[in-house]
Amino acid sequence: TILAWPHNPNDWPGKFSPINWVYTEIVKNIVPYERVRLIVKSVDHEKRIKSMLNKAHVDISQIDFLQFDTDRSWMRDSSPSFIKDSKGNVKAVHFLFNGWAKYDNWKKDVFLPEFLTQTINKKLIAAKYKNRHVVLEGGSIDVNGKGTLVTTEECLLDDKIQVRNPGFSKTDYSEVFKKYLGISNVIWLNKGITGDDTHGHVDDLCRFVNPNTLLIVKEDNPKDDNYYNLNENIEILQDIKLENGKKPEIITLPMPSALWFDKMRLPASYANFYITNGSVLVPTFNDGNDRKALGIISECFPTRKVIGIHAVDLVWGLGTLHCLAHEEPA
């Protein structure tokens, strides 16, 4: 797992202090199952982090500390995408990160894929199409490992708001996904959840839990802003097929009650869980649906330990567990 320890207080205005302890819990629940590559800003930053991890009895022998000065900590979107070729070789694909076509502070993050792949000795392939370096964040797609990818029109096709690749069509994206990710089948949902500053990332919305099963969030309150859009996405899934021509199993996941802070609706969603080799970390929100969501996800992953991570403070940064972590295949 690739993580970057936060150092930018502006990502969690007024709530930065508890974020360090949330990250401590995250690392603590990953290291029993796989190594962590932990990106830190400096030698002093690393010392402070090690002190916190030791206080929490985290096995730091399972952590590789890498010094690189990032802008932000959202590894899902700024890290390279890893693929395995037909011979089983792991390669890294570099999709361009531009701050979700919204923020200006991404000039350091754009060099992260090169730093990481040099550090771990993997080949880095720049995703080029029509003489352009394709912009794509890891949180905007989810795959089943067999050739099917799910994404949203809101994120990739909006031609006015947070435009990633001006002029790109569904056909263009299908070509890019096929060439660089081996994708033969693309599922297009419509809109993401309310409060998501990425403008429609699918990892808050709909996730594969195995090659044949999709977990999608559902809002039952007709007065909630998410109600119409989320139910529309569920309707879209009724007619889709996988790469093998079969219909997927669809499981619905509840949404927590609307979570607000400082007059902002936050993108709280149980779908932003993170899968490790032996555990599944699920964001929880002090909500009545926490237990229900943990139960549903536990049934989807019977061989993994499902662990709730308190994310009320974390989501003030407008993302949670899947957003901040990135898997690296062995």
Predicted regions and their residues:
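The feature marks the mature, well-folded catalytic cores of soluble enzymes
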Residues: T1-A330
